[in-house]
Amino acid sequence: MAGHSQFKNIMHRKGKQDAQRSKAFSKLAREITVAAKLGTPDPAMNPRLRAAVIAARAENMPKDNIERAIKKAIGGDSENYDEIRYEGYGPGGVAVIVEALTDNRNRAASDIRSFFTKSGGNLGETGSVSFMFDRTGVIEYDADKASADDMLEAAIEAGADDVASSESGHEVYASQDTFRDVAKALEAKFGEARKAALIWKPQNTVAVDDETGEKLFKLMDHLNDHDDVQNVYANFEVSDALMAKMAG
């Protein structure tokens, strides 16, 4: 099992360790506050904030929590978070990118380096693996929002690079430069997306055996469970059997 669907499933496994809703909401609130602080507190005028709010809604985060996170930025009483990207190699030489928002750079770096080392991998310098990924925008819609043909036609017309449709929904990919315009065009036609964000999409994936795959999933679990970590991306694929086992 390769391609779009497994990449999506691997990236979205974070939902398993984020089952503790308070931890999930805390991470979402942190992104909302940072986005509002860096730009305008109006989601309609701030693409990053809008994406953060959409992500929060998709996780059923209460409206009050969302508004409180925005108000923290407006009030100026929020913590100062640094955006940091960590890059390294996990088990099997798999490339891993970690995006974090932290109020303590030393703590975050120490913890994340420890996770890599204990997994048999190593944390590298910025730029050590990101050249193997594309900074890409992804816009996701539920399957019932449009047929595969209608979504493909609309996406191409809007300037998207690629579309993947399945029973679980539609994933539209666009370059970093055209992403916002594509998202806006699709929203005008199909309504609000369930997700619209910039991601690190691997240019190619590496097939790993089940033993290595389990080690990689364990590393990703540790990373995703860290309070400072917002997103984790990796360029591997595993067998259908292991994917089903780890998702269950």
From Swiss-Prot:
Residues 1-22 are annotated as: Disordered. It holds the Pfam family TACO1_YebC_N. One of its GO terms (biological process) is regulation of DNA-templated transcription. Keywords: Cytoplasm, DNA-binding, Transcription, Transcription regulation. InterPro entries: Integrase-like_N, TACO1_YebC-like_2nd/3rd_dom, TACO1_YebC_N, Transcrip_reg_TACO1-like, Transcrip_reg_TACO1-like_dom3, YebC-like. Its main location: cytoplasm. GO terms for cellular component: cytosol. It is found in: Cytoplasm. One of its GO terms (molecular function) is DNA binding. Belongs to the TACO1 family. HAMAP family: Transcrip_reg_TACO1. This is Probable transcriptional regulatory protein RPB_4273. It comes from Rhodopseudomonas palustris (strain HaA2).
